[in-house]
Amino acid sequence: MSRYRGPRLKKIRRLGALPGLTRKTPKSGSNLKNKFHSGKKEQYRIRLQEKQKLRFHYGLTERQLLRYVHIAGKAKRSTGQVLLQLLEMRLDNILFRLGMASTIPGARQLVNHRHILVNGRIVNIPSFRCKPRDIITTKDNQRSKGLVQTLMASSDPGKLPKHLTIDTLEYKGLVNKILDRKWVGLKINELLVVEY
């Protein structure tokens, strides 16, 4: 299956708020779940919805998500915890969390158009896995800095997770450590995704 490029608000109404997909939030009165689906939820449906939340929030294809679940399953720690850490340490997600992009698809575009440097080298792969002590900057040209400047000025520094630090004057971000579970920006039960 390919990456989803359709109407984002339909997905938000069905699955709930997905901050990585769009800044908009669903209205409380327009909840499709309450209008059409009453009664008991089946376990399969609950697990599928959790998986779809994860997929649409991080902008993954089905194959990419399966690959991440497989890698997390090989780890000695909790599979769900490792899965979220792998997804949160992707370059496109870190740009979104730093406030350099308004959404994860916007961060993917910045990376694909070669505006981002990691440790002084151009990286054009959005799924690049960042490590602790990686320094993420924009290119030195005016166009790259201009794209990021307006977004960083409007972002809230209080929402910055503890595993990241940002220098707004130099348009530079630093990955301090691996993410803790409590700083994940999405309300999700990752164990249901692993079970699916």
From Swiss-Prot:
Q: Which PROSITE patterns match?
A: RIBOSOMAL_S4 (PS00632), S4 (PS50889)
| Protein purpose | One of the primary rRNA binding proteins, it binds directly to 16S rRNA where it nucleates assembly of the body of the 30S subunit.
Q: What does the entry give for GO biological process?
A: ribosomal small subunit biogenesis; translation
Name the chain's protein: Small ribosomal subunit protein uS4c
Concerning SMART domains, the annotation shows:
Ribosomal_S4, S4
Q: Name one GO molecular function term.
A: rRNA binding
Domain of life of the source: Eukaryota
Keyword Plastid among record annotations: yes
Q: Which family does it belong to?
A: Belongs to the universal ribosomal protein uS4 family.
Describe its partners and assembly state: Part of the 30S ribosomal subunit. Contacts protein S5. The interaction surface between S4 and S5 is involved in control of translational fidelity.
One Pfam family name from the record? Answer: S4
Domain S4 RNA-binding: residue ranges: 89-169
Give a yes or no for keyword Cell cycle in this entry: no
What keywords does the record list, in alphabetical order? Chloroplast, Plastid, Ribonucleoprotein, Ribosomal protein, RNA-binding, rRNA-binding
Give the Gene3D superfamilies listed for this entry: Ribosomal Protein S4 Delta 41, Chain A, domain 1, RNA-binding S4 domain
Cellular-component GO terms for this entry: chloroplast; small ribosomal subunit
**According to the UniProt record, which cysteines are disulfide-bonded?**
none
Where in the cell does this protein reside?
Answer: Plastid, Chloroplast
